[in-house]
């Protein structure tokens, strides 16, 4: 029996869920469970998810961090992968998660995201996402960087041990953005961060909406403000896109 649970936080993901559900059904080996935690969708996401055979719980108007915390608390699997609805998992995701976390020195893992849309691959943004995994902790948390900490984000399809996630308090429920970076720091005393050399496709919808250079500017400035402790109204600088 699989020991990997998948938590999918959703908010207005009616257009992305059908494709994700097909890919989840094709995972080999299959996960122990898939749990959709909805944050108050108004586009029929919950109904679509249930029609696709997915287990759904509602956790409305509390933000994505609280949704993920609720999902991790609800699932039973000892290993958990947080998968965004606009991210396309490889068919061996469960095996990769299990193999990576078999190393007791690793507390947190993630895939290498490649942003793409119907017309193009966002090579510039994908490269920036890759290098900031290293340069952000190296510049702003060098003592943790030397201990193996890297900064992962939602597009990385992060995975971890459920008991360790709960032991550090999970995500900060008050964080609108950069909650994944906070988790990387919180898990640092428990082990290293492993960026798996496996590509995972994720939607470029934010880049398409903002434009590539503006998107990278937003990513950079939000990250800098987080690193410098300037977190007031940080979420206002990261507009919601669907």
PLM feature spans:
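Glycine-rich, basic loop-to-helix element that forms the pyrophosphate-binding segment
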Residues: 59-75
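Short, flexible, basic/aromatic active-site loop/helix in glycosyltransferases
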Residues: 111-118, 127-151
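A conserved acidic beta->alpha catalytic loop
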Residues: 38-46, 87
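Acidic helix N-cap motif at the loop->helix transition within catalytic regions
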Residues: 15-19, 43-52, 92
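Short aromatic/hydrophobic "clamp" motif used to bind/position activated sugar donors
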Residues: 80
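Acidic donor-binding loop at a coil-to-helix junction in glycosyltransferase catalytic cores
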Residues: 177-183
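Short, acidic, metal-binding catalytic loop of nucleotide-sugar glycosyltransferases
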Residues: 22-31
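Conserved donor NDP-sugar-binding/catalytic core segment of glycosyltransferases
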Residues: 92-124
